[in-house]
Regions:
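Charged, often glycine-rich, active-site loop that binds/positions anionic groups
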Residues: 2-16
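A general alpha-helix detector
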Residues: 16-17, 35
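Non-catalytic, usually N-terminal nucleic-acid engagement modules in DNA/RNA processing proteins
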Residues: 21
Length: 125
């Protein structure tokens, strides 16, 4: 599920920035530029397949809400990443997927989420 959400996210990011990227690539930081570059590589057939899987998954989430009003779960399994960690995640797919394991399903389905802080690191993050 996280892989589907990630592929859709990068493709949608590339589409959103299509008028200014890559012509103004230098104005983008390395993290966002990397996401857009990855999004530009997602082909049309893959996007269609992802759309069908997204619709099927969204229907399952809708069905879950037929028997309950709320799903409680963690948002992240570790502290928020630093900018250096984010930059590393551009090339480390496993690290990216681990960070989004809990939120990706709802990014994919489009259901609303509320995230509440549950602590902080020594750096205050």
């Amino acid at each position: 599920m996280a892989t589907d959400a990630l592929q859709l996210c990068v493709a949608e990011t590339a589409y959103t920035h299509r008028e200014t990227y890559p012509s103004r690539r230098d104005a983008y930081g390395p993290v966002l530029a990397g996401l857009i570059d990855n999004g530009r590589k997602v082909d049309a057939t893959t996007l269609i397949e992802l759309g069908y899987r997204r619709a099927a998954f969204t229907a399952k989430i809708h069905a879950m809400f037929g028997s309950g009003d709320l799903i409680l779960m963690p948002a992240m399994n570790r502290a928020a990443p630093t900018l250096d960690e984010l930059a590393r995640q551009i090339t480390n797919l496993d690290e990216r997927l681990a960070r989004m394991a809990f939120t990706a399903p709802f990014d994919l389905s489009g259901h609303p989420c509320l995230t509440l802080p549950g602590g902080a690191t020594e750096a205050g993050v």
